[in-house]
């Protein structure tokens, strides 16, 4: 195979791989329609209460609002499991010495990294499927 043939083959592979990603569009088609939908799940309901000032949470010294959040979402603190994967918004903070703690119940996951002010949440919304949230404890 000559240099020109290899360049044409390479160019064909590159052009084919640059086709528009359609994965994002599927969230805007029925039945999901994310941008037109309003979440109705335990986290969105808790978010509404927080915005209205209906919750009086006192942060703890080392974990911030984690315990209050778990109690409000009815997640047992004993559900904790540790995860070392860096597939997180906080991947740069996660290490063998600082794993991400995951707390969960049947519908909700809460991710916490020691020393971070960000909590990651995922909930199974009945109408929208998996919905992801982040909770910045600095703003509370």
Tell where the protein language model's regions lie, with residue ranges.
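Generic low-polarity alpha-helical segments
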Residues: 1, 139-140
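Bacterial N-terminal signal peptides that target proteins for export
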Residues: 1-10
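Extracytoplasmic c-type cytochrome modules immediately beyond a signal peptide or single-pass transmembrane anchor
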Residues: 24-138
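Bacterial N-terminal signal peptides
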Residues: 9-17
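Sec/Tat signal peptide C-region and signal peptidase I cleavage site
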Residues: 19-23
């Amino acid at each position: 195979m000559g240099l020109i043939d290899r360049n044409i083959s390479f160019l064909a592979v590159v052009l084919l791989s640059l086709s528009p990603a359609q994965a994002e569009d599927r969230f805007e088609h029925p039945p999901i329609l994310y941008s037109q939908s309003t979440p109705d799940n335990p986290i969105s309901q808790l978010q509404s209460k927080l915005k209205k000032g209906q919750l009086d949470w006192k942060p703890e010294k080392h974990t911030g609002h984690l315990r209050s959040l778990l109690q409000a979402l009815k997640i047992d603190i004993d559900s904790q499991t540790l995860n070392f994967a860096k597939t997180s918004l906080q991947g740069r903070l996660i290490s063998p010495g600082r794993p991400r703690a995951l707390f969960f119940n049947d519908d909700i996951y809460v991710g916490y990294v020691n020393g971070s002010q960000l909590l990651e949440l995922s909930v199974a919304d009945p109408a929208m499927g998996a919905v992801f949230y982040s909770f910045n404890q600095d703003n509370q």
